[in-house]
Amino acid sequence: MKCPSCQHNGTRVLDSRPVDDGKSIRRRRECESCHYRFTTFEKVEETPLIVVKKEGVREEFSREKMLRGLIKACEKRPVSLKTLEDMCFDIEKELRNQGCSEVKSELVGEMVMDRLAKIDEVAYVRFASVYRQFKDINVFIDELKDLIKKER
């Protein structure tokens, strides 16, 4: 690796340690020529996961976007941010483990709703009402009936 100070091509690693829950490695380096010390970070470059929307539009998967939707659905509910972050992480991990570079938004939405129904039913209904675009109260009632059936 080139030294940022003198541009010499030889550096040695003084210290390495995992950071960001093991997703990255922090390395302390020293230039063999000028002895300048600097830090580098190394992490795996992930293949982007593409979400295909209902209209056919493609966009890169965003765990942050999914988390924002969940936070909105769980507003004023006894669901911790950690629980929601873990859910988002698990969903992303499951999607990536499928080995596909593209996933349908419907699959992502169903995965969110399956998990949310087990965590908080009110948040589930809130999320489902936006995700499934309930047109009237009857659709809302049908969803509640389905939820009650699943409980029994």
Curated annotation (Swiss-Prot):
GO biological process, one term: negative regulation of DNA-templated transcription
MF terms (GO), sorted A to Z: ATP binding; double-stranded DNA binding; zinc ion binding
Cofactor(s) listed: Zn(2+)
Gene deletion effect: Suppresses the synthetic lethality of a dnaA1-yabA deletion for growth on rich medium, increased levels of nucleotides in the cell, increased levels of DNA replication elongation.
Zinc finger (unnamed) residue numbers: 3-34
Transmembrane region(s): none
Function according to Swiss-Prot or TrEMBL: Negatively regulates transcription of bacterial ribonucleotide reductase nrd genes and operons by binding to NrdR-boxes.
Family in the record: Belongs to the NrdR family.
Protein name: Transcriptional repressor NrdR
Organism from which the protein derives: Bacillus subtilis (strain 168)
